[in-house]
Regions:
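Charged interaction scaffolds used for protein-protein
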Residues: 1-12, 31-50, 67-124
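Elongated alpha-helical scaffolds
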Residues: 54-58
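Short linear motifs in exposed loops
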Residues: 16-17
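Conserved active-site "lid/cap" helical segment
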Residues: 46, 59-60
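Helix-loop "lid/cap" segments that line or gate small-molecule binding pockets
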Residues: 60-66
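Short Gly/aromatic-enriched secondary-structure transition segments
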Residues: 22-29
């Protein structure tokens, strides 16, 4: 499991990336995390906002992977949707993208196609 701390709604929140993150995201969105992150990276590179609804689901999935139960997280999903600042959402999304790359051992600048089916993370 890879973890990073971010500030959301004025609170320190630990996000995690592991297989549980991918499973939770798929259950919420019915989309593979690989496909979502690929589109998010393309949007960021084109200076467009990624799909905000799926971005929030990715953050919730990442919080659930760390805290195991939504009620244990320092913020609730409703806080995230209603009170989080755009910069906080963006920072959290960049943290998730970074953790995913680290989990799959993808060097910076590596083509996205190599991430799917790559080496398993060091802590799975």
């Amino acid at each position: 499991m890879i973890t990073k701390e971010v500030t959301i709604c004025g609170k320190q929140v630990t996000l995690a990336y592991c297989y549980a993150t991918e499973i939770a995201f798929k259950n919420m969105c019915n989309e593979d995390m690989f496909d979502f992150t690929k589109h998010a990276i393309e949007s960021i590179q084109a200076e467009r906002d990624p799909d905000i609804e799926k971005t929030i689901y990715a953050i919730i999935a990442s919080m659930m992977a760390y805290y195991e139960e939504k009620d244990k997280a320092p913020i609730k999903d409703t806080d995230l949707m209603k009170e989080a600042k755009p910069v906080e959402i963006g920072t959290a999304m960049l943290a998730i993208l970074s953790m995913r790359a680290e989990f799959y051992h993808v060097p910076e600048g590596e083509p996205e196609e190599k991430q799917k089916g790559g080496k398993k993370g060091k802590n799975h």
